[in-house]
């Protein structure tokens, strides 16, 4: 019996990379796992199979985490299909690096939308469910660059700093209702995304 037996976790951006590793670890601990990614392609289908191999319920959902309406729909669908939402991991993220003086508004907006707005979207959609359950755990995957900054990554750094502040604020708002919120700020991890840097 694992630490998360009977719990349902949502992990955003989990078809590969850090999100996939988190989803697999949760499944190994007995959690049912719903995960999202922009598309559920061969990577997503393979991830779904790998999660299910632990004997838990697993399903990947194609969803644009940066879109408020998409997020509300997918969270409601997950609640209907899984019965509860106990854990939310806001992991969806992208990079579009460049020096400030060369960065376009589109580069800035894309990173803030996927990395930070998506966390707001999912927290906003999951909070009423967790409040009715009187329990829940929200985890924002931030980054060490959200604490220290990094040249050429002002958009990414700002988005990750925002995720840290968001977690702190949500913890204060929802802690008395049995809902925890934390941010994790890892250093550089080799993934498909970082291989493109």
Language-model features, listed with the residues they occupy:
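Active-site helix of classical SDR
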Residues: 123, 159, 167
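Canonical Rossmann dinucleotide-binding motif of NAD(H)/NADP(H)-dependent dehydrogenases/reductases
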Residues: 2-34
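Alpha-helical segment proximal to the catalytic Tyr-Lys
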Residues: 128, 172-176
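Conserved glycine-rich Rossmann-like NAD(P)H-binding loop of the short-chain dehydrogenase/reductase
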Residues: 31-46
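Residue(s) in the substrate-gating loop at a strand-loop-helix junction
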Residues: 143
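The beta1-alpha1 cofactor-binding region of Rossmann-like NAD(H)/NADP(H)-dependent oxidoreductases
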Residues: 41, 62-74, 105
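Substrate-binding pocket helix/loop in short-chain dehydrogenase/reductase
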Residues: 99-100, 107-112
């Amino acid at each position: 019996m694992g630490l998360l037996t009977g719990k349902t976790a949502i992990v955003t951006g989990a078809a590969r990379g850090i999100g996939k590793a988190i989803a697999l670890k949760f499944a190994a601990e007995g959690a049912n796992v719903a995960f999202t990614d922009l598309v559920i392609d061969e990577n997503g289908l393979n991830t779904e199979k790998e999660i299910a191999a632990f004997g838990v319920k697993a399903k990947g959902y194609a969803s644009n985490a940066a879109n408020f309406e998409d997020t509300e729909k997918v969270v409601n669908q997950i609640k209907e299909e899984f019965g509860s939402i106990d854990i939310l991991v806001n992991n969806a993220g992208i990079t579009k690096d460049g020096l400030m003086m060369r960065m376009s508004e589109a580069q800035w907006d894309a990173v803030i939308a996927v990395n930070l707005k998506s966390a707001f979207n999912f927290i906003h959609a999951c909070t009423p469910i967790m409040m009715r359950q009187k329990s829940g755990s929200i985890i924002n995957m931030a980054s060490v660059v959200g604490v220290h900054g990094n040249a050429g990554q002002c958009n990414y750094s700002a988005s990750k700093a925002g995720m840290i502040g968001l977690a702190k604020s949500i913890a204060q708002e929802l802690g008395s209702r049995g809902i925890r919120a934390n941010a994790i700020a890892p250093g550089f991890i080799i993934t498909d995304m970082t291989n493109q840097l």
